[in-house]
Amino acid sequence: MADVNHVVLVGRLTRDAELKYTSAGGALCRFSVAINRRRKSGDDWVEEVNFFDIVLWGRQGEVISQYLIKGKQVAVEGELRQSRWEQEGQSRSKVEISATNVQLLGSVLGGAARAEDGEFSSSRVAAESTAGRVRGTSSDSRSPTGDILGEKRGLDATSSLDEADFSSSDLDTVPF
């Protein structure tokens, strides 16, 4: 049987994403996710929090980094990677998750942030971005507007929420 290195996590961002560039010009997005775990200890429930460092390379990381805001719920898919280095004569190592896909599942306040098909993923964002602008997002907002609003308000991919007509619509149908 072949070895398997596959990780899937759902948690909340502990801080805003950090976007850096390598000397060769490659984008590197770093962020951390907290995952709560409840377990029974005798008659009581004990909550434990685990923290995981995540990296997302390339165009996907570059584009989605602006939406990775502290408190947002995300799903991360990737693999474990171990970095090793020497520091002051001591061998050091760190295990982090190298993400292949990141999906925004909810806002800081718990509402869903969705795009066309109900998901807002890093691979979809990278494919749909043109000239630094992400389809289905407002130019002045860090949250996706999505086609849920766009279809009902007459918005297209280059519109912002400021251009929408909210006067005669039932806003209770918006899922966030």
Curated annotation (Swiss-Prot):
Residue span(s) of domain SSB: 4-106
Listed PROSITE patterns: SSB (PS50935)
Keywords: DNA-binding
A single GO cellular-component term on record: nucleoid
CDD domains: SSB_OBF
Domain of life: Bacteria
Region (Disordered): 118-176
PANTHER family per record: SINGLE-STRANDED DNA-BINDING PROTEIN, SINGLE-STRANDED DNA-BINDING PROTEIN, MITOCHONDRIAL
NCBIfam families linked: ssb
Subunit-structure text: Homotetramer.
Protein name as annotated: Single-stranded DNA-binding protein
Organism: Treponema pallidum (strain Nichols)
